[in-house]
């Protein structure tokens, strides 16, 4: 209890200092007030911990003095989800004094009722383990499905335990012969991304049509396939054709981030930490094929454009039109903004000199944060140096401001 007394003295000193600061002319400063509040909080925590530790020691001493049968009966009164240490701080022990002795018969009666409820709960759990309901449901399900008409399927679907026993979409209807269940081959795993959406632009229909197994019956295919009007919205191939998955582009083209520069109103698309047009210029980029980008990808190579406040609806319509049609001379490509280099003038950026200074200061460590190029053996042929410098300056605007702000 010596630590508790020290904590009490700290509390009294802190309270006196806070109270005296109201009457003084200058008062105590803000950092001193915060320091006093911090000391006050720590002292309170220490006092409470010492208080509860003392109560716990008293409880342990009382349990050691009690007979073992009474101690076991007290531990059995604890709730199922409550630990034994939490049961120690009951109303009998925390109250203390003659008041607790006066309430002892009532508390014992309440604990006895809790014990009976706990025993009843355990008996119900044991009964459920001995007589599980799903077994009887599954045992009676084949007879009900085989002998009942087709209208009983709705009644079975209302039962929560038999929800998994409903026949699938491709199951035979009423009047057809029910074949016995045979251990057939396991269902095939979902095909690879290349099988879902092939890279050949001559077969665009395969991306939106569901894949059909060679040995499947026509009736099963007709029953399992959704209507033609909902096929684009329900099939994953349609979305893979419009928005290619990260695995289609390779490892280094997996993420895409669009950054809006609030000062210059420039929208910059950064993929996995570097500009996508730098990736497209690479001769070994898997998302653009082997070689330089063709004329079909010229409209999708640039990712920077001017941003105006009233241009969202017009841009959405243009993007919707770009998604509907594939590039005539290339493979399906990620939806990227059109190149508008004529609208963008990097010389008008107010912090171009600051950006160049930051680039020279940070050096390769800062350039590695924005552009992550391949190995030296896979470097593309050098492009126009002035254009690359302008693109780098424009893309570094938001990054440098964020670093300077922090």
Curated annotation (Swiss-Prot):
Segments of skewed composition (Pro residues): 182-193
Spans annotated as Disordered: 166-195, 216-235
Domain of life: Eukaryota
PANTHER family: IMMEDIATE EARLY RESPONSE GENE
Family recorded in the similarity comment: Belongs to the IER family.
Protein name: Immediate early response gene 5-like protein
Organism: Mus musculus (Mouse)
Lineage start: Eukaryota, Metazoa, Chordata, Craniata, Vertebrata
């Amino acid at each position: 209890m010596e630590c508790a007394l020290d904590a009490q003295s700290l509390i009294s000193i802190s309270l006196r200092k806070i109270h005296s600061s109201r009457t003084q002319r200058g008062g105590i400063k803000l950092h001193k007030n915060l320091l006093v509040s911090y000391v006050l909080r720590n002292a309170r925590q220490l006092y409470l911990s010492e208080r509860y530790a003392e109560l716990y020691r008293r409880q342990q001493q009382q349990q050691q003095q009690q007979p073992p049968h009474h101690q076991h009966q007290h531990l059995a009164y604890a709730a199922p989800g409550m630990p034994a240490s939490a049961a120690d701080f009951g109303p009998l022990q925390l109250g203390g004094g003659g008041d607790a002795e006066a309430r002892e018969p009532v508390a014992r009666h309440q604990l006895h009722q809790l014990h009976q409820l706990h025993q009843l709960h355990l008996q119900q759990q044991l009964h459920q383990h001995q007589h599980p309901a799903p077994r009887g449901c599954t045992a009676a399900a084949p007879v009900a499905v085989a002998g009942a008409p087709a209208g009983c399927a709705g009644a079975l679907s209302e039962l929560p335990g038999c929800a998994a026993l409903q026949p699938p979409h491709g199951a035979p209807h009423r009047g057809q012969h029910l074949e016995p269940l045979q251990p057939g081959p396991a269902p095939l795993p979902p095909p690879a991304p290349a099988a879902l959406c092939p890279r050949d632009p001559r077969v665009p229909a395969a991306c939106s049509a569901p894949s059909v197994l060679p040995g499947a019956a026509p009736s099963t295919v007709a029953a399992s396939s959704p209507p033609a009007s909902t096929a684009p919205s329900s099939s994953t191939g349609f979305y893979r054709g419009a928005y290619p998955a990260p695995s289609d582009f390779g490892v280094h083209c997996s993420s895409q981030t669009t950054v809006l520069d609030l000062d210059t109103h420039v929208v910059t698309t950064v993929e996995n930490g570097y500009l996508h047009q730098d990736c497209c210029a690479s001769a070994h980029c898997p998302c653009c094929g082997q070689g330089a980008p063709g004329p079909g990808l010229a409209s999708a190579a640039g990712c920077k454009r001017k941003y105006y406040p009233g241009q969202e609806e017009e841009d959405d319509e243009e993007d919707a039109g770009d998604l509907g049609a594939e590039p005539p001379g290339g493979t399906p490509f990620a939806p990227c903004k059109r190149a508008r280099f004529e609208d963008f003038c990097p010389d008008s950026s107010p912090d171009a000199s600051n950006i160049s200074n930051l680039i020279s200061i940070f050096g390769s460590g800062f350039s590695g944060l924005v552009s992550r190029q391949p190995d030296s053996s896979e470097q593309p042929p050098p492009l126009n140096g002035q254009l690359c410098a302008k693109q780098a300056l424009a893309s570094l605007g938001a990054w440098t401001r964020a670093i300077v702000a922090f």
